[in-house]
């Protein structure tokens, strides 16, 4: 009598949007929230609310292709009852209370190239990190697929490398309660 093959758990379903135009802020929001909640139109509406009387909106690209700033990300999260907390790079990453954090959004320098030619320009790129079923993932919209970072040590290693390169900013996506209690920070 043969035994049935051992059932293997299926890999977790990880939501991951790929890069389109300069919409990395929209992709980072949706990736960190693990569903499509925001669109370019929704981000543009937030821009209009942030600068209602501005002819040239300072929160997005002049070309209308995205390139949203941190104010748009923070307002989008606030609209969902969430908060973005700036991580102070001077703090040791061991003080980051990851179980209290829904996800992370990083703002990284991104090289500009024209084919094989690298241009001496610096752009910024928004990247989401999120835990799904106990595994942290790099959900960079420029990646073909989510990149598993592993457990808390893996995400701390990734963050340390990103911060060591300089010009990296880290936002912690947390609930309002976690923000108000300050329990995203482990000081013990």
Curated annotation (Swiss-Prot):
Pfam families: Josephin (PF02099). One of its GO terms (biological process) is protein deubiquitination. Residues 11-188 form the Josephin domain. The keyword ATP-binding does not apply. InterPro entries: JOSD1/2, Josephin. One of its GO terms (molecular function) is deubiquitinase activity. It is found in: Cytoplasm, Cytosol. Its EC number is 3.4.19.12. It is an enzyme of class 3 (hydrolase). It comes from the Eukaryota. SMART domains: Josephin (SM01246). The active site is at 24 (nucleophile), 125 (proton acceptor). One of its GO terms (cellular component) is cytoplasm. Keywords: Cytoplasm, Hydrolase, Protease, Ubl conjugation pathway. The keyword Protease applies. It catalyses: Thiol-dependent hydrolysis of ester, thioester, amide, peptide and isopeptide bonds formed by the C-terminal Gly of ubiquitin (a 76-residue protein attached to proteins as an intracellular targeting signal). Cleaves 'Lys-63'-linked poly-ubiquitin chains, and with lesser efficiency 'Lys-48'-linked poly-ubiquitin chains (in vitro). May act as a deubiquitinating enzyme. This is Josephin-2. It comes from Mus musculus (Mouse).
